[in-house]
Amino acid sequence: MNTIPSSNYLSSCPNCGRVISAERLYKGSVCSECLEEDREFNSIRELVNELSRLNKLNRLNYIKEVLREYDIFVELFKRIIGFPPFGPQKSWIIRVLRKESFAIIAPPGLGKTTFGIITSLYFSSKNFRSILIFPTRSLVKQAVDRISMYSNKTNIETKLLYYHSGINESQKQELYKALNAGDFNIFIATNRFFIDKINELKNIKYDFMFVDDVDTALKSSKSAETILNLAGFSKDDILSVKELLRKSREDESVYTKIQEIRGNKLKGKTIVFSSATLTRGNPVLSALMGFRPGSSVIYLRKIIDTYAYLPNNDDDVVNLLKELLNKLGEGGLIFVPVDKGQEYAKFLEAKLSDSFNVVTITSSNTNKIEDFANGNIYALIGSATHYGILVRGIDIPWRVKYAIFVGIPKFKFKIGEVMNLVALSRILSMIGLITKDQDIVRLAGRVRGKLRKLSPAAISMLTNQAREGKLEDETLLRAYEVVNKYLEDKDILKKIAELGDLVISNGYILMPDYLTYIQASGRTSRIYGGELTTGLSVLLIDDINLFNILNRKLSLILDEIIWQELQIKKNKIGSSDLTEIINKINEERERILKVKKEGEIEPSLQKVKTVLFIVESPNKAKTISNFFAKPSIRQLENIRAFETVLEDKILIVAATGGHVYDLTTQNIGIYGVEVQQQNSHFNFIPYYNTIKKCINGHQFTDFEQGNQCPKCHTTQIILDKTATIDALRKLALEADEILIGTDPDTEGEKIAWDIYLALKPFNSNIKRAEFHEVTRKAILQAINNPRPFNVNLVKSQIVRRIEDRWIGFKLSTKLQEDFWKEYCKNYNCKSEENKNLSAGRVQSPVLNWIVNRYDEYNANKTKIYYGSIKGIDELKFYVFKQNEKIRKNANIYVKIINTKVLEEEINPLPPYTTDTLLYDANQFYGISASETMKIAQDLFELGLITYHRTDSTRISNTGISIAEGYLKQIAGENYTKIFKPRSWGEGGAHEAIRPTRPLDVDQLRLLVDEGEIELAKKITRAHFLIYDLIFRRFITSQLVPLKVIKERIEYKICEDSNCNSELKTLQNYSEFITDIKLPIQLDYSKFLYLPTTRIIKNSIIKKLQETTGSTNAELVSKIQLTGSFVKSTVNLYTQAELVAEMKRKEIGRPSTYATIISTILKRGYVIESKKTKKLIPTQLGKEVNKYLNQKFSSFVSEERTRNLLQLMDMVEQGKQDYIQILKDIYYEIKSIR
């Protein structure tokens, strides 16, 4: 890393909260007031020890206490286990020592129970009390035995109490008495015991409570209430929180009130919940305990997906299954499609049982799963349905090795019969999308809302009620009615098949149940002890079309899935040896079983790390954390941390909410930048402070006296990024590694740099993660391939920000004071200063363009009249006002000179860059540049498009494969005739703006509506419009050239029927596109981009001939002039044209185009016309422009602005010294008088 840029951060010293230099933070140190010596520290421990030695500890004193107790804890841990705690355990220990209550959501084998037990012994050594709650009596017994063994190992005397079923009544009373008197160190019992005895036990005094397998503890509301009572919450507290949660949608401040209740009642208590897969959520418990549960749906999978073809008769199927079971060995799950029913499962069990010990699992014999787990059953058979017991209710990583699917998991129903509610919901949504009937769209929304609140078992029950004619729900009955009606329409059926990825065969509708495939195959690949096991899935294909649809759906959900053919006779999977694969899977299971049986964590678990992943946006944080499992959520200060699981990582994802620091407005140096000069040598030191926001939406860095907002003087401050830094520093202390994944541009690099410096004293292992799309694959690549920080990008941003501040503040002050006084004299307004006025290096030349263009427009205006031949409204004729005869309702004559049909080949345009997207969004839909950028930012953060601030047209191989996948989907094997892959550019990290999945807008809308793609925020019609533009432009960029069929009509316009006197017209021809042709017959309406007018399907030439009754090319028609408008030969700017001009003249950058236009509008210098969206300067704008050009033209000239931006680009590339540029700007502003 080259020399770091000088800067100072106010209120940021980790120890005293005063100003600290970037150099000291970079060295992991504190400010010079706290530590005179300027030296480097490699860890927070080293820093704290030095400050302690000098008696200078202040805010960091709490860390000294935590570290001291951490060392004691670790020593105890080592004495018991034989080696120190690993990544996540270190994090859990620190959180306990900070007296935080939290939930551990981690896979089996990461030592959660061990941690809980050792923590209770640690507290016992301090003479504190602990309660441990387990789901079963056998686990209570195991915990008692382990505590006894551990206390003997460590010589910790502990008074251990536990409840077991063998004690008599007098012993029970003695137990209750001891508990209520506090005469114990550790008490262990089952969850059931506490539910039954809560009245006797709710006043127990304790310091630490550990709830093992909290899923069991949350099975019922009574169970959850018991936990809350034990935590100290009363019934009134629970009722209050329920009421507050009802209001939370309208009023987020209720969470502050809940936090107060939590703080008051949990005082002095630390409560830890443990679960492998916390899927049950109790909103009140979550709110009061300060976390939200995650889920078991983990999309990480290390599965070899294989296929073979299902034989046509049952005997051959049985023989194939026997062969597979023999080759693959024990530990298999066999899934039968739900349409074949339990009878088929029982049939297979009977046929296979003569050779293997196999059992069909139903709700009545789930105890057999334990026999299977213990190795007493060879394989299990179950139903391939989303709510099947083997699909959802089994997690045995040491035993399950492979899954066999006897047919594709599917929904299958006869057209007209009662279908599964999940299928009903999907088809209803498709019908709404196809018909555009808002009643159906709303009905589909209500059905989805109902189903999302129901468990799989409840959905199954309602489906059965519908089939038996017992369904009473009016909404669902209406949904069945609508679907059955539309399924009788063959056109609708065809469109549903195209849109919804289903197969219609012999009067049946087949839909692949891809979520069941993911869940069921996922049983073979689980995380255990920091290792993601390898699994094998064998899919026996019974319908090739359905398989193709399944493959497409899985690719959308899993990013990538590779199918290999299983050749059982050749003992091959693809080109790999089947025996080698099975041996590898068996070795993994033996290793896991060894860990499980020995009950200890292997030292190899040291590779498991806690990783803090920091991004800007909460939406992006939520999107990323959802890629791997539904995350658990923690609230720290003003940020939410999403905790999720990777193979060997616990990932904590948190968001900064954009920039954390900005230049101070305090009276330091020149507008917050200190200038140091020694002879000809300069240094520029910007001073940064944390960003704040008041209740009225004003953003600032520095309070007025009395913690007031400097703009509106309120003391109601809703955001202070100091709290963000504090929260991130807490998380940094827990993490083994920190990755900062802010946007891949100069602003993103500066945010990352600021965070890096703020956290460096707390954790030295910090790197930069770069990604250009928010997809699972891209995020994993970024996590696994971090890079150093690019200080050149940081320096470039510093130059931009200082230049913007200096020029902006200097010129703005002139406008607000000097200019405004003069303006008010001329226009009779108050002569006080106007703080809304501003000027900037880029803003000012752009304003000048708008003013000049408006003047040119006015100077070249003329009136134009128009009319058309009766019956052909599409063909309009325009003439200039050139004499008194040309007026409204006057007649003129059109002589058709020639008509012809042309065929032209049009090469596709490249995919979007920022400027071209802004242009088209404004031209096609009238969406402003700033609104388009907000929408594109959302689409990027939600993982739907690549990074949107780019001037590159390059498309990666990944992008090309997305286009290929989509075209193959819609055109089948003929897609090669229309697909022409193009990269549109070479090298570089940035790509053009493109979709991240092969989904057109209708497919995306359907997946979002059905909840198959879960987005971190709701998207609007405008989001879909912009996505549609991006998708069309991208797909078209990968097509062969288009053949465009045009009709051209050439004519003269005259005053008389003989055309002796020709009139001046706008143009003497009209062209119409009547068709677009591709090499194959295809409906291109969903994916083709045309930068042109609409396609006229009916021939204008034919209409002309039919209307006039003549085929004569020399035809003369009399037409009436029906209207007029004023037109100039010079067009006013639209936002689209202004962006194109900025790009052409190299003024501004992709990240600033929208901001510049937005600022000019906000200042009132320009207004936008309502209908035509033209930009018109106001009187104020004209006068500001005149003032700036007269007095400061050299500072706001196009040439100077362009040169400066080029110099900043050179700083980014490391080709220019940023100090030299700042020196030039410094002299420049010094000359402003």
From Swiss-Prot:
RG N-terminal-type ZnF: 1-41
Xref: CDD domains: DDXDc_reverse_gyrase, SF2_C_reverse_gyrase, TOP1Ac, TOPRIM_TopoIA_RevGyr
Cofactor comment: Binds 1 zinc ion per subunit.
Domain called Topo IA-type catalytic: residue spans: 790-1233
GO biological process: DNA topological change
Zinc finger (RG C-terminal-type) residue numbers: 691-720
Residue span(s) of domain Helicase ATP-binding: 93-296
Domain notes: Introduction of positive supercoils requires the cooperation of both domains. The helicase-like domain probably does not directly unwind DNA, but more likely acts by driving ATP-dependent conformational changes within the whole enzyme. A beta hairpin in the 'latch' region of the N-terminal domain plays a regulatory role in the enzyme, repressing topoisomerase activity in the absence of ATP and preventing the enzyme from acting as an ATP-independent relaxing enzyme; it also helps to coordinate nucleotide hydrolysis by the ATPase domain with the supercoiling activity of the topoisomerase domain.
Homology family: In the N-terminal section; belongs to the DEAD box helicase family. DDVD subfamily.
Name of this chain's protein: Reverse gyrase 2
